[in-house]
Amino acid sequence: RDFDYERFRKIANDNNSYLMCDMAHISGLVATEEFKSPFEYCDIVTTTTHKTLRGPRSGLIFYKKELKSKIDFAVFPGLQGGPHNNVIAGVATQLLESMSYEFRDYIKQVKKNARTLADYFNENNYELVTGGTDNHLLLINLKNKGISGSKLEYVCEKVDISINKNSVFGDKSGQFGDCATEGYPGNLISSLDDNGVTINKAKRGEGTHW
């Protein structure tokens, strides 16, 4: 449930193609070596800075030197205007924090939280895509529950649980989706260790009636 970048690199080489990785969701895990790094194999790597990196809303583009002129031309002036120096300072501060032992412990706890809840779902007849998780995300296939991802998203929002609908193999419509995506960095920031609060509420049936 991690990426085989070496295999992707071989496929790209066989087709004379660039290999690009968008690690927006997993960049915090990559930064702390809790997930494989794409940098050895990819020509271009992009990421947001506000997800698992826990910084301000921004983005980063890494690329091989021979692609500099093409990347620069694509970004400015077509996509980017003047820089926001306050955001740049915020990103720099967060990147420094991501090198700390405290941030590494935070990422490890995020993964532990996700695995704890994955175990709970598996024990209660929920079908997880890939059977579990090795990062901070859970993909729950809801086909055997008779509820769409969009409806579950709406219900969870009413009880202050943030998820989003997603598509899963076999879906006929991407508008509603039979899959729900859940991520756990925000829960940990709110001091939800091992998802204990969420699991206890789920066991009692609180907020689960739709």
Where are these regions (language model features)?
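Detector for Asparagine
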Residues: 13-16, 85-86, 113, 122-125, ...
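Residues at secondary-structure transition points
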Residues: 34, 65, 138, 189-192, ...
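Conserved PLP-enzyme active-site core in the AAT-like
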Residues: 1-125, 146
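PLP-dependent enzyme catalytic core of the Aspartate aminotransferase-like
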Residues: 112-113, 174-210
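Short, basic, helix/turn surface patches
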Residues: 45-55, 154-159, 186-195, 201
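Conserved PLP-binding catalytic core of the aspartate aminotransferase-like
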Residues: 127-181, 185, 189
